UniProtKB/Swiss-Prot annotation:
GO function terms (MF aspect): metal ion binding; UDP-3-O-acyl-N-acetylglucosamine deacetylase activity
Pathway stated in the Swiss-Prot or TrEMBL entry: Glycolipid biosynthesis; lipid IV(A) biosynthesis; lipid IV(A) from (3R)-3-hydroxytetradecanoyl-[acyl-carrier-protein] and UDP-N-acetyl-alpha-D-glucosamine: step 2/6
EC code: 3.5.1.108
Residue sites binding Zn(2+) per the record: H78, H237, D241
One BP annotation, GO: lipid A biosynthetic process
Name of this protein: UDP-3-O-acyl-N-acetylglucosamine deacetylase
Top-level taxon of the source organism: Bacteria
Gene3D superfamilies: lpxc deacetylase, domain 1 (3.30.230.20), lpxc deacetylase, domain 2 (3.30.1700.10)
Keywords for the protein's UniProt record, in alphabetical order: Hydrolase, Lipid A biosynthesis, Lipid biosynthesis, Lipid metabolism, Metal-binding, Zinc
Length: 303
């Protein structure tokens, strides 16, 4: 039987929210089988818990935000991406702010935290959501789609009119049967343009942004002294975001995702349309490990 997984130990980190600029204390705690991923606002009395599920998605203009009543938790996608990438099913995530810490702008520090805590199997079957038919959303020149595939594959294309983007690949297809999430995706950082910075600051956004937690570009070049971590870091970060958004389905996806110039808003619309199209998916478990798509085998996920 392919089993659910949680952390072996409690692990903590501190950082700042990229939009609020506030200091955030983050604690990851093991959770029982069938709990799922639960965010807990421990700065509130009583504590408010928000499940990482599609029906709690709120604002998606700059990041993926979860809401419950008037309580919100912003920028959940990087941590969710890390949890999906290493295969954690059940977890309590305590935080003392309405936004997760941005860390270095990638999922790498979260992967390190998870690996530091250790992962343990639980005595309950892991559920997957398997795509049975294509579901697509198009909006002008943007599109997102999921379709059947016996594994986990993401294709993504971006299109920025900037000298640096023209030099680097703006399209990528990653099949996770042969691609290591940890090595080849998790360290891709979020990026932004200096030309947008003034507008963003005027609107009291990105108060915690810096060259330590984002790739920043002027009209011609990257301002970060260390340069790119991957030649295709820009499009890989978009893939990292997609993996986090997809994990709001509450289960690992068996299927293929394709996106063109999409962001969190279009991603969330696709998730809602998918779940509403009952004939397009099914929940599956695997008694026989040999039937599991290779992308989800322990060998592939820990590489």
């Amino acid at each position: 039987m392919i089993k659910q997984r949680t952390l072996k130990n409690v692990v903590r980190a501190t950082g700042v929210g990229v939009h609020t600029g506030e200091k955030v204390y983050l604690t990851l705690r093991p959770a029982p089988p069938n709990t799922g991923i639960i965010f807990c606002r421990t700065d509130l009395d009583p504590v408010v818990q928000i499940p990482a599920r599609v029906n709690y998605i709120g604002d998606t203009s700059l990041s993926t935000c979860l809401t419950k009543g008037d309580v919100r938790i912003a920028t959940v996608e990087h941590l969710l991406s890390a949890l999906a990438g290493v295969g954690v099913d059940n977890l309590y995530i305590d935080l003392t702010s309405p936004e997760l810490p941005i860390m270095d702008g990638s999922a790498g520090p979260f992967v390190f935290l998870i690996q530091s805590a250790g992962i343990e199997e639980q005595n309950a079957p892991k559920e997957f959501i398997r795509i049975k038919q294509r579901v697509k959303i198009e909006e002008a020149d943007k599109s997102v789609m999921v379709e059947p595939y016996n594994g986990f594959k993401i294709s993504f294309g971006i299109d920025f009119d900037h000298p640096l983007f023209n030099e680097h690949n703006q399209n990528a297809t990653l099949d996770f049967s042969s691609t290591s999430y940890v090595k080849e995706v998790s360290r891709a950082r979020t990026f932004g343009f200096l030309s947008d910075y003034e507008f963003i600051r005027k609107n009291n956004l990105a108060l915690g942004a810096s060259l330590d937690n984002a790739l920043v570009l002027d009209e011609y070049k990257i301002l970060n002294q260390d340069g790119l971590r991957y030649p295709d870091e820009f499009v890989k970060h978009k893939i990292l975001d997609v993996i986090g958004d997809l994990y709001l389905l509450g289960r690992s996806l068996i299927g293929s995702f394709s996106g063109v110039k999409s962001g969190h808003t279009l991603n969330s619309q696709l998730l809602k349309k998918l779940l509403a199209t009952k004939s397009a998916w099914e929940i599956v478990t695997f008694k026989d490990p040999s039937e599991l798509p290779f992308a989800y085998t322990p060998v592939a996920m820990t590489a």
